[in-house]
Amino acid sequence: MTRSINKWALLALLVVLAMMHGSPARAEDELMGLQEIVDQANPGATLVLKPGTYQGPVVVNKPLTIRTEGEGNVELINRSQLPALSIDADGTTVAGLHITDGMVKETPTVLVRGHRAVLNGLYIRTGGDGIAVRDADEGLVTNTTIDWAAEGVRLADKGNGVDVFNGHRWRFMDNTIRDVHDGIYMENSDDTRVTGNRIERSRYGIHCMYTNRTVIERNEGSLNVTGAMVMTARQVSVIGNSFSKQSENVNSQGILLYDTHDSVLADNTVDGNRVGLYVELSTGNRLENNEVRYNFVGIQLLDSSSNSIAHNRFTGNVADAQARSSEDNRIIENYWDNFRGIDANGDGNSDISYAINPLFQELTKKRPAFQLFFQSPGMVFLEGLYQSDRDRWTTDAAPLMTPPMSENQIGDAEGRTLTGIAGLVLLGCTGTLFFWMRRRMS
Amino acid sequence: MKDMKYVAIREMNIGFRNPWAYSFMALFAVFMLSLLIIHTQGGVSGFSGTSGTMLNLALYLLPLMALMLGSFSLTGEKEEGNWELLSTYPLGTWPFLAGKYIGLSAVLLSIVAFGFGLSGSAGWLLGSGFDFLTYKQLLGFSIGLSLFYLGIAMLIGTLARNRWQALTIAVGVWFFTVIAWPSLLIAMLGMMPYLWIKPAITTLTFLNPAELTRLFTVVKLGGGSTLGPEYYKWMIWIRSPWGTPVFAGVMLVWIGAALAAAYGLWERGRGRG
C-alpha cells in the first residue's frame, strides 16, 4: 500500500517537474522498455521520448500522445513476434518514431485497434504489414515512410504497407511506401481518403476491396505491378494520380477497375505501363481527362457497360485500345494519336468514328498463346480484314482531332544527342562508302 | 579466302551501281523520316507507339528488300551467263556464295545505315528523336532482320531459274512470313488440342526469322509483358545476359543452314551442268 502511494507520489512529482520543463514525462533510461514508460503515464498525457533506442513490443491501452524530442533519433526496436506497437485505446497519437521490426512474421509492425489514432512522421521498417488497422475508424496516417526490411523475401510473401480492415473514414496523406506487397490495402473500409502518397516497387500501389466512396487523389506510383487497383467498389474517386513504368509484370496496369461502379476516374496520368487503364465488369463509371501515354495498351475494356469515357488523351501507346463485350459505353471526344479523322464541319470532332477492333482480344481470350502476335504486322493486317459486326464494336463516336490538354511533357533530352551523333556517324560512313565505291567504278 | 573477297568486292561494285539499291534506300529513308514526323510528340523511347510502328515498317520493307536484292543477284548471274563464265575459273561454290552473301550484306546494311543515320540525325535536329538505347535496339533489329532474309534470299536465288521465278518466290516467302503468319497459325493451330498450341507456336516461331527477330526486339525494348503470362520465362530469359549471344547464335545457325542448303543445291546443279 505504502509502496503504491510512494509510486503515485513519485509519478506526480515527475509530472510536475516535467511540466516545469515544458515537457511532460521524460523517458529517463535508454535501456528501459517503452512499455514501462507507457504504463506509468496517465491517460491523456503527452510522452516526449528522449533520443535513444527503445525496446518493443509496446501496447498502448490508454489515450496518449507519444512524441519524440527533435527529429529522427528515437528508435523503437522489436525482435518479438508481437507487433512493435499496438494501439488499443481511442485517440492515441504517435509521432516521429523510427520503428525497426525486421522479423518476417504474420503480425504487423503497428497494429491499430483504437479509433481516431494519429500516426505522424513515423519511419517504419517492417517484416510484416507496416501499419494494420482492424475495426477502428477515423484515423490519420501522415508523412510516414514504410520500407520493407527483410532480405530475400518474394513479393507475394511480403506484407502490406498499410492494411486496413473494417476501418472507416481513415485518411492517409503524404506517405512514402516502398518494396512491400500492397502499398495501401483497404478492405471493407468506407470513406477513406488516400492523398499525396508515393508508392514504389510494390505489388499494387493502392488496393481497394469492397469499399465505398474511397477517395484516391494526387498519389504517385512507379514500378509497381499495378498502380491503383479498385475492386468490387462503389463511388470511388480516383483523381489526379500519376502511375508510371508499371510494365514489367505480365499483369501490370496503371489503374484497374474491376467490378467497380459509379466511380470517377479523372485527371490521372498513366505513363509507360503495360495497360494504362484497365476496366473489367464495371458499370456507370466516368473516365475523363486522363492522360494515357506510352503504354503498351492504352485502355482495355472487358465486359463493361454504361461507362462514360470522354476527353481522355491517348498518345504514344502501342495499341490505343482493346475491347471485348463492351458495347453500351459512352465513348466520345477522346484524342487518339493513332487515329486520323475527318472534320468537315470544323467543330473539332471527327465526323467518322473510331471503332476498336475486338479480334485480338477475343482470340487471346480463347487461346492466350496467341498473345505472341500482339501488334505484329500480320496481326494488324488480319484486324484490317476482320470487320464483321462492326456496329457492335466499342466505338468512339466523335474522336477529337487535336489533343484536349496542353502538352505538359516532352521526353527527356538525355540520350537524344547521342542518337543524333550516332545518326551523323552512320550517315558519314555510308556517304564515304558510296563515294568510294563510285570512284572505284569510274 | 581471296576468291571470297574478290566475289564480295565485285558484288559490292555491282550492288552500288544497281538502281534498285538506291530506290530501296530512298524508300526506306523516306518512310523512316515520315514516321518520325507523324509521331513528333515527345520522343521515342522503349516500346511505344512510334517504335512499334518503326518495327512494323522495318518488318514490311527490309525482308522484301533483302529477298529481292539477294535472289536477283544470284539469278542475274545465271540469266546473264556470268555464272557460266565464272565456272570456267577455278572458283569454288563456297567462296562464290559466301562472297555474294558478304557483298550483298554490305550493300543492304549500308541502305539500313543510311536510313537510320538520316532519321537519327533528323530526329535530333527536329527535337523529337530516338532515345539512344531504343535507336540502338531498332538498328540491331533491322540489321538482324536483313541478314536473316539475305540468307533465305541466297536459297531462293539458287532455287529460281530466272528473275521472275525469284520474284515470285521472294514475294511468297515475304507474304507468308510477315503478313499471313498470324492468320495461318491461328487457322492451323485452332484445330489442334489446346495443350499443343504453345509448343507448336514456339517451334514455328523459331522457323520464322521475322517473328523471331521481332519478339526478341520487343522484349529487349521492354515490351515483354505484352506477350502475356504464357511467355514469362522467355521474357526473363531474353533479358538475361545470355539473351543476345544466344539470339546471335540462332541467327548464325539459321543463316549457316540457309547457305549450306544453297551450297548443296548449287553444287548439284554444277555437277549436272
Which ranges hold each PLM region?
Chain A
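Bacterial N-terminal signal peptides that target proteins for export
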Residues: T2-A9
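Bacterial N-terminal signal peptides
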Residues: L11-M20
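Acidic Gly/Asp/Thr-rich repetitive segments characteristic of extracellular carbohydrate-active
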Residues: A25-G56
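Parallel beta-helix/beta-solenoid
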Residues: N42, N61-P63, A89-D90, V94, ...
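Extracellular beta-strand-rich solenoid/capping regions of secreted or surface-exposed proteins
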Residues: Q55-R67, E75-A117, G128-A136, V164
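Extracellular beta-strand/beta-solenoid scaffold signature
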Residues: N78-L85, M103-L111, T126-A132, R154-N166, ...
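Functionally critical loop-and-helix segments that line ligand-binding/catalytic clefts
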Residues: N249-Q253, Y294-L302, N307-S442
